[in-house]
């Protein structure tokens, strides 16, 4: 299958066919396209045209396409469909994890109505079961579809069961072996059962060493485990060890992307998860808290400057370097905190090595502070200062501010992480605001001491 590229010409041609009501030609245009490509097309169409395309798909492909549509768009898209259509045309043909995510996005009343119209009662039961788990746990990520065989079966029985169970799966990553109580015992490869005698017992063939996670395992931990052991799928067990589902790499990738989006927004000073398609009020609510905090922080900085009004009036050139000091402090702090937050998120930085990281950061900060301070010293000399008081003030202040910002930007995320608070809060507006206030204090106090003494 060739990679599809959505062009303006293709979209215009498709819209003309839709407006003409030519369902046959529309079906030909999208035939053979991957569900993700069709989802991309639907997101570019208005709701009426998207529905026309969607209803031209067969039930199985419609379910696959719906799973690929962005969550926010998907919620708006299905609002116009009756509960019976959602249940029988879409949810009955989706994987249990995708179906559960879709149902979870509906109001409670609509959830009950949709589930009551489902023809696949086993699928309905799986969805209800999955809805009980927190979305940020292994239980919330897992799907119920898997291939499971009993350790007491023969290879012949196993082959028959694998063939039957595989009908509900797109890919078979592993065959899981359980005992009579459905407790996970190990895994079995397809090669093993194909090459083994049909009369052989599964108990003599399976691999007992298998990595699994419990339903309440945090999703972030699941992602780290799968990354560490290079897994494409991992079984999920309940508290007593019974096999209840499996998580595949695509589910983990989706979770990682969502978490990265949240962290990026938090680092940008957006307190809630918002999309460009959200209402103006929703976007305002997400941005306003940090803007108000930044406003009050700016007022604190203004008040601090007013306290040194006499010194600034006596040495007006002092005001010229305030933006340099605050900008450098903010930039250095963000750089340091971003490195720490990245390390904590990828589990490559532990609290045990936190002190070592601070020491390393101090070393780097000393080098950066020395270089930047030397540059600013030479630049201030170019302004033709009559004395060395101002160059020394700016140079010394910048050196101390860079050193402090580096240490603070490194230590604060580690402290938040130890307090079980998302360290992403430590980056962006908070670091900038804190370093602005403290950096100004350092600069103005240094100026008062040096300028009044040497000026």
Where are these regions (language model features)?
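Hydrophobic packing positions in regular secondary-structure scaffolds
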Residues: 1-270
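Alpha-helical transmembrane segments and their membrane-interface boundaries
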Residues: 262-425, 429-433, 442-455
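Active-site His/Glu-centered metal-binding helix of metallohydrolases
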Residues: 437-438
